[in-house]
């Protein structure tokens, strides 16, 4: 089928408005333009953005001679409770805000101009635990074809074996006829289809797809006057006593959880922003992404294929127990099978997708009904695609606590909270909501630290409340359960364990455990890159920026990324590179010297707020806390030619030093056990002059694409001055400014 992009020609307005809509280009996040107020019902979840319902309009022109053709609209993502109307008739309803879905236009079209309306609802707040965005935030396209055509998503490709490399290609057609298939480097082949044609091809000297060598092949299928083009990778996935293997070789999944937003762009799924995010994560040392907690975009899959990034595509954040008042729970039972079907159809041909996850921190897995549902969903996914394992991210400690009544969400609580919020809003006052569910536990962990959650997971009751659900998935997904790994691998000799959500400071420990135990298949840190909403959960901010640490209106992001909201790698990213053996370091990072000893906002998801800078103007004479990250026997730290200290590195790749701050040259040197130098890292203090330096990430950019430009206060040589402050005004000639901001949560 032929795809026509429908990114332009749209207007958007609040549903019910009588004024003409504003002209917009898709993908479009309508929520990003809304005010942030203390009365926002989404509150800390959404970064204080208000929620509204939206109406999008455009026309579709259908020539008289094409009216009998097949016309199918594809919406890649509409948040949420989407309605599609054609010529005044309701053509479709799809409640889940993160799924792609299709609309058969045939019953509603006429020749000439047709009115297309799409409604996206987001006034029903709160409906998400993080910033969702709203509207048509992913692309829309129209698929068309004549009577004889290849069905939409009608080409399926899988690798059968590697020696020799054999791929199976299934083609589904709307009618009988001859199917012609071309794969680069192979002769053209033809088969007759009775609705399906199956090709088995041998590829000599195949170029395999791996994270290190993401080789892709192009497959072109022709049937009658129709054509479909797919890319695929030759690769196999296996799981068992040898752990997780790709092409027969064990691969340790070293991943990062990410939300779907793109920072300053909001929820807009821009291919350039997505490509940048994948690149930054890979440079940090990750080889995998967990799409938390919803199916990822097609743009992300294409980039992960191209760049060599493994993907765990996750379905949802809840099943039948609410986490927010107006979430997907009322629709879940009716729609989960269709949602999973669409997720698998989207993912099937992508070599990057190696895992499916049915959910995140679903405490339903502690209940008899939820245990049965775990098996039902796993089996359903196996029926759709048996080539990939199925997991579910289970917070072991939360399962136990929720089973004895702590922090449980209920409809009764929701009703009371909604009534309080409505009364407060009517009076023009903000209301502080009682934390329940995941937020209750996250707040508790923030106050008590990561050890609270990890130690809690070792309780016997945690095993009791998870073991039956774990038996109903291919790989057991442990959220914050690292202290259980050794015990459970011994107790359950058939179990494979995935750290489906973990703390940054456990990266080294995980890597060393995984190297010794194949059934520990991988790890996904929370989180790889900062994201909008769920404010303050992963941030260390001081009182000059965040009075009272209350997560109030000034906050917009979580602050929990190893990479900040603007895409800048932090000290934690440098630690991660070393812990995951991207390289051996050394790297130096320095905690903010202007705040040495000061209290900061609490978070278990922050390992350090150190940054690679030795330019702390006005802090002369104050104590500086310095961190060195290296895989080495020992490290030395030097300041202005004199040694500050030596530290042996045992069971970690992290050394701390303390010194009185003075400008100059700070240098770390790493050594092996024989005393041979392995590497060195230097930080130099910036000079007196201060200027704004604009640094584009690309040397050139094509029309219609993004160019990220970092603005920094620096000296004349380009050394950043982290304490310099000021107001910046930006004007763009020859382009459009689509986002401007800093990384302060």
Regions found by a protein language model. Name each.
Residues 179, 212-216, 623-625, 631-633, ...:
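Short flexible loop/turn segments that cap and initiate beta-strands
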Residues 110-111, 170-239, 654-656, 660-664, ...:
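Extended acidic/polar, glycine-enriched regions
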Residues 35-62, 66-75, 79-86, 92-95, ...:
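Active-site-adjacent substrate/metal-binding segments within catalytic domains
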């Amino acid at each position: 089928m032929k795809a026509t992009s429908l990114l332009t020609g749209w207007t958007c307005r609040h549903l019910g408005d009588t004024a003409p809509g504003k002209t917009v280009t898709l993908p479009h996040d309508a929520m990003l333009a809304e005010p942030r107020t203390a009365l926002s019902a989404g509150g800390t979840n959404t970064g204080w953005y208000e929620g509204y319902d939206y109406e999008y309009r455009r026309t579709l022109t259908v020539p008289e001679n094409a009216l009998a053709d097949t016309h199918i609209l594809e919406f890649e993502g509409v948040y949420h409770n989407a309605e599609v109307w054609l010529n005044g008739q309701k053509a479709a309803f799809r409640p889940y805000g993160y799924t792609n879905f299709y609309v058969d236009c045939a019953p509603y079209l006429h020749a000439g101009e047709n009115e297309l309306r799409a409604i996206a609802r987001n006034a029903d707040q709160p409906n998400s635990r993080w910033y969702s965005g709203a509207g048509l935030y992913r692309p829309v396209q129209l698929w068309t074809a004549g009577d004889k055509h290849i069905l939409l998503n009608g080409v399926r490709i899988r690798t059968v074996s590697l020696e020799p490399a054999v791929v199976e290609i299934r083609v589904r057609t709307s009618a009988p006829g001859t199917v012609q298939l071309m794969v680069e480097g192979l002769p053209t082949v033809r088969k007759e289809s009775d609705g399906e044609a199956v090709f088995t091809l041998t590829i000599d000297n195949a170029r395999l797809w791996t994270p290190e060598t993401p080789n892709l092949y192009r497959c072109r299928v022709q049937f009658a006057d129709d054509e479909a083009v797919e890319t695929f990778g030759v690769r196999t996935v296996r799981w068992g006593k040898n752990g997780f293997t790709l092409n027969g070789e064990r691969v340790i999944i070293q991943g990062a959880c990410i939300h779907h937003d793109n920072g300053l762009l909001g929820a807009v799924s821009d291919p350039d922003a997505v490509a940048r995010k994948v690149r930054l994560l890979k440079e940090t040392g990750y080889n995998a992404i967990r799409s938390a907690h919803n199916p990822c975009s097609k743009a992300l899959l294409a980039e992960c294929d191209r760049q060599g990034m493994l993907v765990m595509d996750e379905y949802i954040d809840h099943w039948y127990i609410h986490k927010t008042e107006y979430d997907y729970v009322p629709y879940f039972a009716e729609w989960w099978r269709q949602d999973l079907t669409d997720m698998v159809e989207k993912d099937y041909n992508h070599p990057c997708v190696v895992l499916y996850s049915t959910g995140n921190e679903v405490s339903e897995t502690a209940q008899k009904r939820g245990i049965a549902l775990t098996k039902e969903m796993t089996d359903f996914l196996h029926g759709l695609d048996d080539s990939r394992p199925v997991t579910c991210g289970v917070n072991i400690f939360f399962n136990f606590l929720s089973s004895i009544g702590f922090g449980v969400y209920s409809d009764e609580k929701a009703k009371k909270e909604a009534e309080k919020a409505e009364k407060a809003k009517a009076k023009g006052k903000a209301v502080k909501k009682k934390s329940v569910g995941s937020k209750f536990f996250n707040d508790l962990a923030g106050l008590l630290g990561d050890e609270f959650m990890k130690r809690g997971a070792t309780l016997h009751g945690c095993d009791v409340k998870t073991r039956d659900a774990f038996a109903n998935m291919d790989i057991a997904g442990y959220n914050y359960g690292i202290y259980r790994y050794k015990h459970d691998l011994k107790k359950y000799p058939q179990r494979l364990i995935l750290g489906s959500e973990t703390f940054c400071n456990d990266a080294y420990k995980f890597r060393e455990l995984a190297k010794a135990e194949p059934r520990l298949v991988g790890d996904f840190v929370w989180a790889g890159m900062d994201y909008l909403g769920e404010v303050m959960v992963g941030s260390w901010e001081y009182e000059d920026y965040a009075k009272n640490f209350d997560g109030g209106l000034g906050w917009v992001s979580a602050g929990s990324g190893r990479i900040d909201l603007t895409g800048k790698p932090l000290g934690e990213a440098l630690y991660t590179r070393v812990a995951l053996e991207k390289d051996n370091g050394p790297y130096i990072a320095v905690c903010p010297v202007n705040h040495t000893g000061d209290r900061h906002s609490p978070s278990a998801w922050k390992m350090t707020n150190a940054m690679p800078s030795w330019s702390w103007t006005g802090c002369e004479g104050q104590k500086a806390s310095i961190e060195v990250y290296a895989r080495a026997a020992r490290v030395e730290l030097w300041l202005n030619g004199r040694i500050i200290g030596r530290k042996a590195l045992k069971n970690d790749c992290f050394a701390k030093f303390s010194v009185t701050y003075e400008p100059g040259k700070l240098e770390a040197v790493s050594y092996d056990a024989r005393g041979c130098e392995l590497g060195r890292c230097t930080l130099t203090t910036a000079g007196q002059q201060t200027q704004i330096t604009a640094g584009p990430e690309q040397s050139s950019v094509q029309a219609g694409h993004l160019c990220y430009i970092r603005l920094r206060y620096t000296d004349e040589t380009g050394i950043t001055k982290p304490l310099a402050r000021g107001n910046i005004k930006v004007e763009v000639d020859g382009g459009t400014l689509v986002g401007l901001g800093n990384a302060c949560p």
